[in-house]
Regions:
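Short, hydrophobic-biased amphipathic alpha-helical segments
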Residues: 252-270
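Short, highly charged C-terminal tails/helix-capping segments
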Residues: 269-280
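Short beta-strand element of the conserved SAM-dependent methyltransferase core
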Residues: 92-98, 153-156, 197-200, 214-215
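Structured surface interface patches that mediate subunit assembly and partner/cofactor docking
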Residues: 121, 126-137, 181, 230-235, ...
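A very general structural signal that marks isolated residues within well-ordered alpha-helical segments
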Residues: 111-112, 266, 273
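Glycine-rich portal/gate segments that line the openings of hydrophobic small-molecule binding cavities
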Residues: 126-206
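Hydrophobic ligand-binding cavity/cleft-lining segments
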Residues: 2-145
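Beta-strand/loop substructures that line and gate deep hydrophobic ligand-binding cavities in soluble
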Residues: 4-19, 59, 188-258
Length: 280
């Protein structure tokens, strides 16, 4: 991750766009919005090293902590688990002015390949979200996520300098009622305006990840999100399955947490203006 410093707020150097990409009307949302590193508090936590393993959420209790109030003991951190799998948790907030319709629109828009770009050049709509790591993203069936979502990203904070070299992956949404979430708990969460969803990812090569996303009203206004990932696990037929072939170590975990931290803040900066420009 190379920072541009000098007479400016330090920000991350991003790959140059192709002439075809620069010609697209929304390319300015890639070029004109600086990509910033994690804020100082987040960076301090990241640099302190892994969290205590006993403070992580074990896979056998992956849904137990979901509640309209209260927090896990640690809400931002990463660690290797005793069985060789990896875990991280990420806490973030959105401002009271944030509108959920922006994100719902973006989720459909960036999963459609731009007609103006030939296949193999990546997807600028997706690159806008995280220019140093994102390359391509699309619905497998071309219409929705029913059959899975295919993506390519590097998750190394631009270390390779070429996001197209990332490992392809396919994500599959799951119904949490089939994996231990009771109808009563689901109703309790919905009544409190909490949202929870999960998916598992399979990589083109060894590896599976299980992802849980949870958001609810923030006491200070807006919404707060708690997202977790268990690297080395996936889901099928109502069961959580261990994949011991999944490659993961502390460096990878830290990079993924930094990647997600950077892109979450960047999308909050870009998306309101992008939505207005494309839907105004």
């Amino acid at each position: 991750m190379e920072l541009i410093t000098g007479n400016c707020i330090p920000h991350i150097k991003v790959p140059e766009l192709s002439p075809e990409e620069k010609a697209l009307p929304y390319s300015k949302f890639y070029t004109d919005y600086p990509l910033y590193p994690p804020n100082p508090l987040q960076q301090q936590i990241l640099d302190a090293g892994p969290m205590k393993v006993e403070d992580a959420i074990p896979i056998e209790h992956w849904l137990d902590w979901l509640s309209p109030a209260g927090y896990p003991k640690v809400v931002y951190g990463y660690t290797m688990m005793p069985d060789g799998s990896g875990f991280y948790i990420e806490y973030s907030t959105t401002a009271p002015t944030w509108q959920g319709k922006w994100r719902r629109w973006y989720g459909k828009w960036y999963n459609q390949h731009p007609a103006e770009l030939p296949e193999g050049r990546g997807n600028l709509r997706y690159k806008i979200w995280n220019p140093i790591d994102h390359w391509d993203h699309k619905f497998i069936n071309g219409e929705n996520d029913k059959d899975g979502v295919w993506s390519v990203e590097t998750l190394d904070l631009g270390a390779t300098g070429d996001p197209s070299k990332g490992m392809p992956a396919v994500s599959h949404n799951i119904d949490l009622l089939e994996y231990g979430l009771s109808p009563e708990k689901k109703k309790e969460l919905e009544d409190a305006d909490c949202r929870v969803e999960a998916c598992w990812e399979e990589f083109d090569g060894p590896g599976h990840h299980l992802v849980l996303r949870f958001s609810r009203p923030c006491p200070q206004g807006g919404r707060e999100s708690l997202n977790c990932e268990w690297m080395g696990y996936w889901a099928k037929d109502g069961k959580i399955i261990r994949d011991e072939e999944t490659p993961v170590d502390e460096t990878y975990l830290k990079n993924v947490l930094m990647h997600n931290t950077i892109e979450r803040a960047h999308l909050a900066q870009v998306l309101p203006d992008l939505y207005e420009a494309m839907n105004g």
